[in-house]
A protein has these predicted regions:
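Glycine- and acidic-residue-enriched helix-capping/strand-helix junction motifs
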Residues: 15-29
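Extreme N-terminal starter segment of soluble prokaryotic enzymes
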Residues: 1-3
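Short acidic/polar micro-motifs centered on Gly/Asp/Asn
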Residues: 6-13
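Active-site-proximal helix/loop segments of hydrolytic enzymes
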Residues: 25-179
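Short, solvent-exposed loop/turn elements at domain surfaces
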Residues: 13-14, 148
Length: 179
């Protein structure tokens, strides 16, 4: 399989920022790079949007994925709302998407591993990266960086390791492989 991993935001666009200054772009880059290494250990081919804190427009992200002829597009994000909001969710373009089942598996496994609510799989035709990719695509909102408890742990080695292992093993199980 050839996976395209899109680590949301970057550079001049930090994405959501927690009250203590933790940037979504930093968290998803760390988690995403760990997922990349785990997938590569399982002999998967992985293309990434970025490997550093760099701003790249949405059109660049989808064009690169389409040119690389990747099998799947996975976008990593942290959510933001009120400081009490908590939970993981996955977005797909429509409920008939090939990745709807994968999305269900991701939120189920992440909610268990991170002890956070399962907010389910949702559909949206307005997310640029879901709309403009030629391959099946999904967007993971790992948890709420706006929640002080989540923000306090989301850059810890344990959180990054648990999250990346859970995502990578779920992706591999979807294509009948193991870590």
């Amino acid at each position: 399989m050839k996976w395209y991993l899109d680590f949301g935001h970057g550079g001049k666009d930090p994405g959501a920022v927690g009250k203590n200054g933790t940037k979504e772009s930093d968290v998803v880059l760390k988690i995403g790079m760990c997922v990349k290494h785990l997938l590569e250990k399982a002999n998967e081919t992985v293309v990434t949007t970025r490997t550093s804190d760099t701003y790249l427009p949405l059109s660049y992200r989808t064009n690169k994925a389409n040119k690389e002829n990747c099998d799947y597009f996975i976008s990593f994000h942290m959510n933001s709302f009120t400081n009490l909001a908590k939970g993981c969710e996955v977005w797909v373009y429509n409920s008939n998407s090939k990745l709807y089942l994968l999305g269900n598996n991701i939120v189920f496994n992440l909610s268990k591993a991170l002890n956070t609510p399962n907010r389910g799989v949702k559909t949206s035709k307005s997310f640029y990266v879901l709309k403009h990719t030629k391959m099946p695509a999904l967007l993971i909102e790992i948890d709420f960086i706006s929640n002080p408890v989540v923000e306090s742990v989301c850059l810890s080695d344990a959180y990054i390791k648990t999250t990346s292992y859970t995502i990578a093993s779920t992706l591999l199980a979807f294509v009948n492989k193991k870590l």
